[in-house]
Amino acid sequence: MTDLPGLRVRAAAAFSLNVRLQLTFAVLLMAVAGFACAEHMEEVVVHGEPLSPFQAQAGMAPLAETNTALLLKRVAGANVNFNGSLAGMAQYRGLYGARVNTAVDGMDIGNACSNNMDAPLHYLPRTRVDELSVIRGIAPISSGLETLGGTVIANSTAPIFGTADGFTVSGHTAAAGQSVDGGYSLSGDAALADRRHRLFVAASYEDGSNRDFGAGTIRPSRYERSAVDLGYARQLTTGVLSIDYRRNDTSDAGTPALPMDDISSDADLLRAGYSAVWGVTGLDATVYWNDIEHLMSNYRMRPARSGMRRDNAAQADTLGWRVSVTRPLLGGALRVGTDGHAYDYDADVADPDNAMFFMQTFHNVKRDRYGLYAEWVHDDLGPWQLMSGVRWTHVSSDAGEVNASMAMMMPALAMLRDRFNASDRSRADDQFDFAAVAAYALSDSVSLELGVARKNRSPTYQERYLWAPIEASGGLSDGNVYIGDVELDEETAWQFELGLDWRTGRFDFAPRVFYHRIDDYIQGIPATDPAVIMVGVMNGDPTPLQFANVDAELWGADAEWSFAFTDAWQARGVVSWVRGKRRDIDDDLFRIAPLNTLVDLSYRAERWSVTLETEVYARQSKVSLTNGETRSPGYALLNLYAEYMFPRYGLQLMGGIENLLDKTYRPHLNGINRVAASDVAVGARLPGDGINIFVQAGWSF
């Protein structure tokens, strides 16, 4: 286990459009204003950050890869549920979707698609990624509001303050292209900075056609996305004040594993910050606001049956904050804090051929979370290092009354509507979490780690407020239609972990074994209500599923390792295995990654390097009968990368070939194809990319 590095204390404020939180924001804004007249000081580092010892970094794959989430395959225990070129959900140790807390530039982005086309990492284009890491094992309770499935941290590139009184200009530009979809990306950023000010602007653009695989083309899988970032920071006597804005526009992004495609996802992301240190006390606060408008369609990028053309317009607004104070206590560091996340959502379905048709899929949905926590870290107790924390989180949710034009002609649908509207939709949960991790150094190179935690998660709006059986399942992509349950209970997980860190400098090996016991796990089960079944039949699924509380358990092991043969020759790899089962019946959990490993062998000279990489996935035969999941065969891939640098000119060139042998393979975590006009059969799992030749160039100044 490595030493605990420094904690950078940050803070934030933002404009509030939510009346319920105006008082909170006013207090934070006044705190920022109170320091606005302060003078310059160096950025302060306070030791005691509890996250870094347990982080596992994702290797940086080529810029040509547009789906940022796919980088997670390079982390032990992590993977990605793939539904489209820009649609990827983080999976960690068999848990995914809302169970995995994902922080993008410190924000918990409330996405606008009920099928997670725009999962959080969608809003950090690959060209802007500076860091993508997973807090390995049990996530500290300070890392987020609901961290039952772990925490993923993604940060974009950002400039630093200058070292002189005069302003200097710096920046980076890059261009990349790849053959698998004829795609290309362009990006650039520039900064103007001195000791006290830091002004930043960045832009990126990505465009690609349908993706090829060994036996044809996946349709539709084309995409287009652009992003613009603006940022400003000011160093003050007691800290740093910053404000950042991102505009992300996605258009015509195919998602063949889902019933509709992403026609547009237009997002405004605003984050403001302030950091301060007084003596040994540090303040860290972040306030952010996200507004996302999203349009889905089942006919604009794929053929639709006559009379069944549909558009779905959705909007999501998020207001969030994190405030914490850190100071020494009993030889360690104590952090106390509060965080919150207020989320509003609406989604309406329309028929472009019939102005009278409408369906309020989700209406006036609110899901608000507020938390208080305390966490203590000590990294110098002789051979011991300790982290422990407790958290209280309040989750409240509600939804407005719904309606649908088809209810006038479908008594079963009218019954479901009336039952939902008459129900008590206002719900509240109080969660109590704790986490404790201890590491013991057996020697200078070997340490043991033991962790235990209790984590909770409340139902998502889909699981609770989906009032009619349709395929708005949070991106499960199993071909089933789902209906929610207002009466769902929260999930409660007991988590246990045992690990070893063996680090000699030349050889590093860090295995972990884990066990999760989850009570009231939320899973679709066969619906028994005749009205639900009748509407399901009319929607093309005679066996609809209803979200329900069941009992589950997951266990497994993962490891990361590296070995330096010489200063130039190095090998590294990760291996992951997880098993997920229902405890209430004899069935397996859905969409669990099979045993897999990634190994690369690299030769690194002063200015150039070459890497041969292999990915190996075992067959997955432990599948969910409830979800109708099919087994998948194993496969192995070879990738080749090369890089050359011209330090004198700030130039970097990179190229490579992925899937060198052009194998046809179907990753188990890929979704099920829904599109007839494709070389992939309807109901078959989406194949992985065929051979992909890519090149990229970058220039730093």
At which residue positions do the language-model features occur?
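Outer-membrane beta-barrel translocator/receptor signature
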Residues: 127-136, 141-214, 221-227, 238-239
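Extracytoplasmic beta-strand/coil segments of soluble accessory domains associated
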Residues: 69-108, 136
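Short acidic/polar hinge/loop motifs at secondary-structure boundaries
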Residues: 108-138
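Flexible loop and strand-edge segments within Gram-negative outer membrane beta-barrel domains
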Residues: 208, 214-215, 219-225, 239-283, ...
